[in-house]
A protein has these predicted regions:
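Structural and coupling elements of P-loop NTPases
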Residues: 1-608
């Protein structure tokens, strides 16, 4: 029987090993039965999370160690999901700061740590992946201390304990050359260093809703830490917003806590514990869930606003309905309502009259994840080019989101990368050596200039560079920026692309289609190296003769089509273009498919 509770969050950059470390903590602490089959990457519950190796939605888990229940919250490691991070930190008594022993301190680490320090958390520093051949643990420790200083950590926070670890091998040690036996030193340090918060158990029940899950059986499930009193099944409760206004009222139908990664029903939730409750259908994240006698809301951390938007409509291409099952604006609306309820980082507005939806999010990845999920669910969509969301200050000055970009690369590529960032109105903030012929560049640049830049960076560094981006602040608008220089190669008619035609057109530019791909008028089938759009015929086969048959068309050698992510394709769009997304395909297209109508639109736009 546990009699104490510790709530701890893990702060780490993408792919610094936090999910693997949590897996081994659970296994070594006995959170699973001996005969239980345990999947790898336990905390990455979503399909996309396991594929990409990133945490998208924060989720709690629990382990028992020496009569203490340790609730562990695995926080997102990508800047686009910072809305999750901010809420999760409010549930924590302490934090594990996990840093790769070779890569060192990275932007996402800095971002989340700054928020944790502002909330008064005192992190335990774990320098992970000590089994790497290029580990530089001592240097990384110095960098970490400098980071704490730069983030205005207080004296107690600067006096952080340090462990060296390998999450994959399942050990942690206070000494760099210690015995490296197991993870017990980390579990013991959590108990000794992280102090449980003091809560008033005698007061009426109250908790802040920090996470929200949709459950087909229970309905809306709210996750939070009980800050006072106890929660009992079947008691009357209500939800009040940050202004103290009642949002909902009802019965607490079910209450759960986490054992391992599973939800276990309980009758009573104690102050200090992280629980899941059901029974209120209108309550939302940042609402206070409480006893009917409570009228004072719990303060919630403000959430940073979205920085980018896209417009989504039904698929209007000639191929609509051939690959997907969810085709109507009503189905899109219902899906976006569901997303906005579960993910406060996403908002949307409906444009009356044309059945289009303006969806706003924190950045490229957040919007790409949503589109990828909808695609896998059977939706067919038409998506506009991304737009940056601007602000104005009190004096009326136009402001735009600025990001901090950290790049690690070979020295030979640095001049090309600096030149590419200058064209995107980036400002070089720092440049330093990180090893033999290695450089680290840090830029501040407008978000609008960075759409799809990751693929460009990887091309410039021949796949050897590492780039990381994080929201920095809103800054003064940097002026107009040059768009895509390449003209579009546009299909002339509907049908199937032919190898012979593609082969002869390859000299005119990069082709996006291969033999037998379906095409239609207005579809962008390639890019020209020159400015200006061009309508081409990708269906023109070789003329037949007595000596040749049509089958010889397919013997030509075609350049393989470049594989691009949704984010890359969105970044390529000009203002008069769109991206068709279906479960099986993504196709670049002109917003207006008919060439005559396009010309009329261009003339009217020029006249205006």
């Amino acid at each position: 029987m546990t009699n104490q509770i510790r709530n701890i969050t893990i702060i780490a950059h993408v792919d610094h090993g936090k999910t693997t470390l949590i897996d081994n903590l659970m296994k070594q602490s006995g959170s699973f039965r001996e005969n239980e089959v345990v999947d790898e990457r336990l905390m990455d519950s979503g399909e996309l999370e396991k594929e990409r190796g990133i945490t998208i939605l924060a989720k709690p888990a629990s382990i028992n160690w020496k009569d203490t229940r340790i609730n562990i919250i695995d926080t997102p490691g990508h800047r686009d999901f910072a809305a999750e991070v901010e809420r999760v930190l409010s549930m924590a008594d302490g934090a594990l700061l996990l840093i790769d022993s070779a890569e060192g301190v990275m932007p996402q680490t800095k971002f989340v740590l700054s928020k944790a320090l502002k909330q008064g958390l005192k992190p335990i520093v774990v320098i992970n992946k000590l089994d790497k051949a290029d580990q530089r643990a001592n240097e990384v420790l110095d960098e970490t201390f400098d980071l704490f200083v730069s983030l205005d950590a207080n004296e107690e926070q600067l006096d952080f304990p340090v462990l060296y670890a390998s999450g994959r091998s399942g050990w942690a040690d206070s000494e760099l050359d210690g015995s490296r036996e197991n993870l017990n030193p980390l579990l013991d340090l959590i108990l000794n260093h992280v102090k449980p918060a003091n809560f008033e158990k005698e007061k009426p029940f109250a908790m802040l809703s920090t996470l929200l899950y949709a459950d087909s059986f229970l309905g809306r499930s709210l996750v939070g830490r009980i800050t006072q009193g106890t929660a009992k099944a079947n008691q009357s409760i209500k939800a009040i917003n940050l202004k103290g206004e009642k949002v909902d009222e009802g019965k607490l139908t079910k209450i759960f806590r986490y054992e391992g990664t599973k939800k276990v029903p309980i009758e009573i939730g104690e102050a200090g514990d992280i629980v899941v409750i059901a029974g209120l259908e209108k309550a939302n994240v940042a609402d206070t869930i409480c006893d009917l006698d409570v009228n004072e809301p719990i303060s919630a951390t403000p959430i940073d606003p979205p920085t980018m938007s896209i417009t989504i409509t039904v698929n209007t291409s000639p191929l609509a309905g051939k690959e997907g099952k969810k085709l109507t604006s009503t189905q899109i609306r219902d899906r976006l309502i569901q997303e906005a309820q579960n993910n406060v980082g996403i908002t949307f507005n409906e444009n009356e009259g044309n059945d289009s939806f303006v969806v706003s999010g924190r950045g490229e990845l957040m919007l790409e994840i949503l589109l990828t999920q909808m695609r896998r669910e059977g939706f067919e969509l038409t998506v506009s080019p991304p737009k940056v969301l601007y602000k104005t200050d009190d004096s009326g000055t136009k402001l735009e989101p600025i990001e901090e970009i950290t790049m690690d690369l070979d020295e030979e590529y640095s001049s090309k990368v600096i030149d590419s960032m200058n064209r995107r109105k980036g400002k070089l903030i720092d440049l330093k050596d990180t090893g033999k012929n290695k450089k680290r560049l840090i830029f501040h640049a407008p978000t609008r200039g960075l759409m799809g830049y990751t693929s460009k960076f990887l091309t410039l560094t021949k796949g050897n560079g590492v780039i990381n981006r994080i929201f920095h602040d809103y800054g003064q608008f940097e002026g107009e920026m040059e768009g895509r220089r390449n003209g579009a190669l546009i299909a002339m008619e509907k049908g199937k692309a032919v190898a012979f035609a593609i082969f002869n057109l390859q000299a005119r530019g990069e082709m996006f289609v291969t033999h037998n791909d379906p095409v239609y008028p207005g579809m962008i089938v390639g890019l020209s190296p020159k400015p200006g759009d061009m309508i081409i015929n990708v269906m023109k086969g070789k003329k037949l003769t007595n000596m040749r048959t049509q089958g010889t068309d397919e013997n030509v050698v075609l350049t393989p089509v470049r594989k691009m992510s949704i984010a890359e394709q969105l970044s390529m769009l000009n203002t008069d273009e769109a991206l068709e997304i279906t479960p099986d395909s993504c196709r670049l297209r002109k917003s207006i498919l008919d060439p005559n109508e396009r010309k009329k639109s261009e003339k009217s736009g020029a006249a205006a």
